[in-house]
């Protein structure tokens, strides 16, 4: 599979310990494939077993979450927290609440988080958590009881200087609030143990917008430096209609682009006149409705069942912001055929390895998730800083810091790729830049894990 015998041994070890965990194995394979030149140039990595250690979580916590529904019936879900790597700082990563959550998904997300967090330049390690609980269709009371039960166990394993979870799919401001309240109740301390908190109890301005805004700052810098171009006058397709998609749409529009499509798990809407974001926010953030309602309210907009069709829409820039592996090889080929010039990932691993190969072999600019969507965790780390100082920055201050971080992530990835004769391969560059910092810290600390 790899040219390096060492990398093949490492991957075979992962396969033996994690059989059938396809998402995790895919993530490991993608990262290891980028590290061939780094391993060849640095024999200390093999001598000190750095790769064997970095692909194995420092700690995996699986637990039962029992809660009572509105009918008085006891329900049981499984909770997860994978503390993957703390070489450069406390574990940091979101909590995903979705029926698709399993050990493989959480491990893949935690593994990716190591490199994403490293790329921000901030002192945060990699971790991830979640549960197969589905908040959709649940009452506020049911969600509160689930979150309290979940945090009762999770609280034993986290802390402001140990592990700082955040939101993710299914975990928004409401869920973070319920979890924070339960942690405070159990520990009798007010501390920055979670990020994504409300502004009245330690949250940060611009956190809600951060992942979507950061995605566009990264993409704008990529277009500027590699194509001498920008969002201005470009047609943009954004998948998803959650937090990341909404604020990517907002920032892309502010930068001069025209977003013509959004989606959810049922289908997608196409508006050739440009998505009207106020309507989307009303449907998704206020009413918690489905994206098909957009077509019912806006003249000229069309709704189509199924999510995959969104990638058949002609566009200059594609921003997948929905979920993992949403762009497969077939969809990638259609995007290329229709003239896409840049793809940047707002979701975690939304493109399959085959799709990425199509983009790269076709000369399409490709911004990988671990770099392009790092704005959320970067601003979470800025929230941690504000909590430590007992101080709050203004929206513009946080936004300016976010933009600087995203611009630096692009350049660090670009330069790392160039260093190993992989110029233009931002995926390899992001993996290398993120890995080198973590590996150096691991070597300096000895065999601590």
Where are these regions (language model features)?
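Adenosine-phosphate binding glycine-rich loop
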Residues: 2-27, 223, 334-449
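Flexible, glycine/charged-enriched surface loops at secondary-structure junctions
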Residues: 22-25, 41-48, 121, 158-167, ...
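Structured beta-strand/loop patches that form or line metal/cofactor-binding pockets in enzymes
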Residues: 44-75
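ATP-dependent carboxylate/acyl-activation modules
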Residues: 84-94, 100-127, 186-193
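Glycine/serine-rich phosphate-binding loop and adjoining beta1-alpha1 elements at the start
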Residues: 117-232
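Glycine-rich phosphate/diphosphate-binding loop of Rossmann-like nucleotide-binding domains
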Residues: 203-312
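Rossmann-like adenosine-cofactor binding region
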Residues: 267-366, 371
């Amino acid at each position: 599979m790899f040219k390096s015998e060492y990398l093949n041994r490492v991957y075979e070890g992962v396969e033996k310990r994690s059989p059938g965990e396809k998402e995790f194995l895919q993530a490991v394979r993608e990262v290891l494939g980028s590290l061939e030149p780094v391993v060849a140039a640095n024999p200390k990595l093999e001598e000190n077993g750095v790769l064997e250690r970095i692909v194995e979580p420092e700690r995996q916590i699986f637990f039962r979450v029992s809660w009572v529904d509105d009918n008085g019936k006891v329900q049981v879900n499984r909770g997860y927290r994978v503390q993957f790597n703390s070489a450069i700082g406390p574990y940091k990563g979101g909590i995903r609440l979705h029926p698709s959550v399993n050990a493989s998904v959480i491990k893949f997300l935690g593994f990716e988080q190591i490199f994403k967090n490293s790329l921000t330049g901030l002192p945060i390690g990699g971790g991830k958590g979640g549960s197969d609980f589905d908040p959709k269709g649940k009452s506020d009371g049911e969600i509160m009881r689930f979150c309290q039960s979940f945090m009762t166990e999770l609280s034993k394993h986290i802390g402001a200087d140990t592990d700082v979870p955040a939101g993710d799919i299914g975990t928004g401001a409401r869920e973070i609030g319920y979890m924070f309240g339960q942690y405070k109740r159990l520990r009798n301390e007010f501390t920055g143990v979670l990020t994504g908190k409300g502004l009245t109890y330690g949250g940060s301005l611009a956190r809600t917008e951060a992942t979507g805004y950061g995605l566009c700052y990264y993409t704008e810098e990529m277009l500027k430096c590699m194509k001498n171009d920008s969002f201005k006058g470009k047609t943009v397709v954004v998948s998803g209609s959650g937090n990341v998609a909404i604020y990517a749409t907002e920032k892309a529009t502010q930068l001069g682009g025209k977003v013509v499509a959004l989606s959810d798990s049922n289908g997608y809407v196409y508006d050739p006149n440009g998505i009207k974001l106020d309507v989307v926010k009303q449907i998704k953030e206020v009413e918690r409705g489905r994206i098909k309602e957009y077509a019912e309210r806006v003249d000229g907009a069309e709704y189509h069942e199924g999510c995959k069709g969104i990638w058949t829409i002609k566009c200059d820039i594609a921003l997948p912001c929905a979920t993992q592996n949403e762009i497969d090889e077939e969809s990638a080929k259609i995007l290329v055929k229709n003239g896409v010039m840049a793809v940047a990932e707002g979701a975690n691993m939304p493109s399959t390895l085959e799709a990425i190969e199509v983009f790269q072999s076709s000369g399409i600019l490709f911004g990988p998730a671990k770099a392009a969507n790092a704005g959320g965790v970067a601003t979470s780390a800025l929230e941690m800083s504000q909590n430590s100082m007992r101080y709050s920055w203004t929206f513009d201050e946080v936004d300016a810091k976010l933009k600087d971080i995203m611009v630096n992530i692009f350049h660090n990835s670009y330069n790392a790729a160039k260093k190993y004769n992989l110029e233009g391969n931002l995926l390899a560059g992001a993996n290398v830049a993120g890995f080198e910092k973590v590996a150096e810290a691991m070597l300096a600390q000895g065999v601590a894990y």
